[in-house]
Structures are given as structure tokens and as C-alpha cells.
Amino acid sequence: MKKTTQLYEGKAKKVFLTDDADLVIQEFKDDATAFNNKKKGSIAEKGVVNNAISSKLFTLLEAQGIRTHFVEKLSDRDMLCRYLDIIKVEVVVRNIAAGSLVKRYGFSEGTVLAMPIVEFYLKDDDLDDPLMNEAHAVALGVATLEELAFLKNRAEAINVLLKAFFAERKLKLVDFKLEFGRHNNEILLGDEISPDTCRFWDLETNEKMDKDRFRFDLGGVEDAYSEVQKRVLDLD
């Protein structure tokens, strides 16, 4: 399968059309951004690492009945995916208080939440991806109530599977972002699952092992991404 026309370029990936109208190629970049593109930089080999991690996790979820856009890993940076009509809703699942949840509600960072919190954000960079509820989403025409209920249920199911997977590899899944899209009258999980889209803390030390190291200039970004890759792929 070969790339034809570039369909889209985002902060972390490029998407290309192929000769098959149902399939696209997602190319992972090393570019890094934070705070809705206000901070920009690069993380060496990030695209390679994130493609490897995402491919493994999509395969895991597919085996557990979670339908995704993933078809196969084509190369170090390229992933073959089903074409999606992206739903403009970012779904965030939170297990431990961190990031904007701490700022909004005054939680102490690291507080284990009584139950996972599922949040919806409007996928719109110009508006800084604002938090929204179901009524906002319906009023904006980005999803129906039935679709939003499906997204919430699917996100909760993914959380159960991923929390257990990462715990076995001595990682806390603090929170993570999911994106979904429509494909042939079906809603599939899209985008990626990686240290770009998840917060990972070491199970024993609580060391941050994700893009927060880039966001807050903590150093050791490449090493953290590489360590997550080793644990996810069981590369001891």
C-alpha cells in the first residue's frame, strides 16, 4: 500500500490517501506541541516510538472486541488505517487527578479518583478545545446523544483494559485522550494511544513518563518515551 495525496497534517501526524478509498496511511512525526500549540519542539524518534506503542495497543484492544481504525503497522513511522470521518469530540478519561483537573477543581495532584471521570471536549484548536457536556455537543451538531453514550461506554471499557495492561508493566494510567470516527455506519477508535495522548506514571516512584516531561521542561523526554515503549512491547 502506497501513499498518494496528503489529506491532512496535524501536530503529531500526517494522513495520506491511498489507492483504496477505505484506507489511509497515518505517518507519525517527531514534532511535539503543548498548551494547544503554544509550545513547540521536537522529540527525537517520537514518531517511531508512538507508532510502535499505538500499533501494539490497538492490536490488544481489537483482540478484546474494541473496534479501531488500525489495520497494520507498515513501517517504523507508517500505520495503515481505515478512513474515518472524525467526530469532533475529544474523550478524556481520568483515573488520577493531574493536569487541568487539578486546576479546575482543586484536587491535589496524584489523588486517586473515587471513580473514573469521563469528559468531553470540543475538538477545535481555535477555541482551545473547550470542555463541554452532552447538550453542548448536540447543540453544536458534532454528535447525537446516542453517539455520546456510545463514546462514554466505549471509553470506560477501554480504560478497564488499558489500566490492567499498564499495571502489569508497572505503569499507572493517570489519564488519556481518545478520538473516534465514523466508518461505514460504525464508530471506531482512531488517532493514537501513546505518551503523547496518555499520562503515565511509574507505579513505584510516580515518575512522569509522558509528554508532561516536554510540557514542563522536566528533561529526559526521549528516555521516558523509550522506557514506555520497552514496557509496552515487553522488551526487557
From Swiss-Prot:
InterPro entries (UniProt xref): SAICAR_synt/ADE2_N (IPR028923), SAICAR_synt_PurC (IPR033934), SAICAR_synth (IPR001636), SAICAR_synthetase (IPR050089), SAICAR_synthetase_CS (IPR018236)
Annotated SUPFAM superfamilies: SAICAR synthase-like (SSF56104)
SS bond list: none
Pathways per UniProt: Purine metabolism; IMP biosynthesis via de novo pathway; 5-amino-1-(5-phospho-D-ribosyl)imidazole-4-carboxamide from 5-amino-1-(5-phospho-D-ribosyl)imidazole-4-carboxylate: step 1/2
Enzyme nomenclature, EC number: 6.3.2.6
Annotated family: Belongs to the SAICAR synthetase family.
Molecular-function GO term, any one: ATP binding
Keyword ATP-binding: yes
Keywords: ATP-binding, Ligase, Nucleotide-binding, Purine biosynthesis
PROSITE patterns, sorted: SAICAR_SYNTHETASE_1, SAICAR_SYNTHETASE_2
GO BP terms in the entry: 'de novo' IMP biosynthetic process; cobalamin biosynthetic process
Name listed for the protein in its UniProt record: Phosphoribosylaminoimidazole-succinocarboxamide synthase
Reactions catalysed: 5-amino-1-(5-phospho-D-ribosyl)imidazole-4-carboxylate + L-aspartate + ATP = (2S)-2-[5-amino-1-(5-phospho-beta-D-ribosyl)imidazole-4-carboxamido]succinate + ADP + phosphate + 2 H(+)
